[in-house]
C-alpha cells in the first residue's frame, strides 16, 4: 500500500508559530524522510467559508499568504503537492455521500465542533456548512487515500470521526476507503502552544500570535512583552514554571545547541529552569534568550519568503498545477465510491437489467 499524507490549513490569516510546532514542522520532517509516496497539503478555503460566507474576500486574500508560509517553512513543491480545496469539486460530492453515514447527534458530540461553535458564538444559530465540516474533512482525507494525517492535538476528534466514516462506508459498501492514522507532535509542549498572553490558544482576534511572517523587531517586541510568572517581581524571587509562557515556548523551540550559541552560562534547559525556580534569574534574561532561539528559527523562513515573494507567478502555477493533480486523484476515489454504492449508472449497461 502506498504511504500518503494529507494535511492542510484554513486560509483565515497568516500562519503562526503555533501552526509551526503543531503540524508544519512535522510536515517538513515527513516530507524529507523519504518514507511517503505522495504528500498533499490543502489550503482549505471552502472550509474557511463556512464561517466567512459573507466575507469571501478575507479568504481569497489569504490564499497566497498561506502558500508563502508553506514555502517559507520548507515545504518543497517538488516533493509535496499544494492545492486549493475549492478547486477540487469531487470533495463536495464525497461530502454529500458521507453525510448519510453520520447522525446529527454524533457531530454534536464532537469535542472540537463543540469548542469551535462556542468560540465563534454559533450556539444560537449554526451554519449547516460549519456544522458539517467534520464530514467535509473526512472527504478531504479519504479522497487522496491518506494513510497519515499530521495534525495538532485539537484535531484528534476530527480524525476519529473520519475513521468512523471510513469504517461505516467499508462495512456498508465493501472495502473501498483507506483508513487513516493520526500523526501528533512528539513534544508535549508542541501539542497546543498558548498565546503570548498566556491564553490557552493563539488567536488572531486576541492579538496574541507570533506569525511566521513577522519581521524580526515585531517578534522581539512580542517576546519581551510575554506573560510570565506574575509573582516573580524581583530577580531574586523564586519563579514558577507552570503557566509561564516563556518557558512553555522554550520547551517547544529550544535545542541543546542554542545554549552554547546564545547562553553558555547554562548547559541545558533543565539548568535554566532550576535557576529560575530557586531565584536569581530575571525574566528579561530568559526572554532575550527565547528571542535569540526564535530568531534563529524564523530568520531562514524570512529569507525563503522574500525569495518566493519575488516569484509570485511561480507560486500561482504551483497552486494551479497542484489543484489539477489533486482533482485527478480525487476523481479516482469518487469513481470507486460511486461504483461501491452502485450509482455509476452509465459505466455499463447493468441499469437495463
Predicted features along the sequence, with ranges:
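Extreme N-terminus of proteins, especially the signal/transit-peptide cleavage junction
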Residues: 1-3, 346-347
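N-terminal Rossmann-like or analogous alpha/beta NTP/dinucleotide-binding catalytic cores
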Residues: 2-139, 257, 296, 305-306
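A generic structural motif
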Residues: 11, 149-150, 208
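Internal, conserved structured core segments that host functional sites
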Residues: 113-115, 119-169, 173, 194-195
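Conserved nucleotide- and phosphate/pyrophosphate-binding catalytic cores
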Residues: 157, 163-353
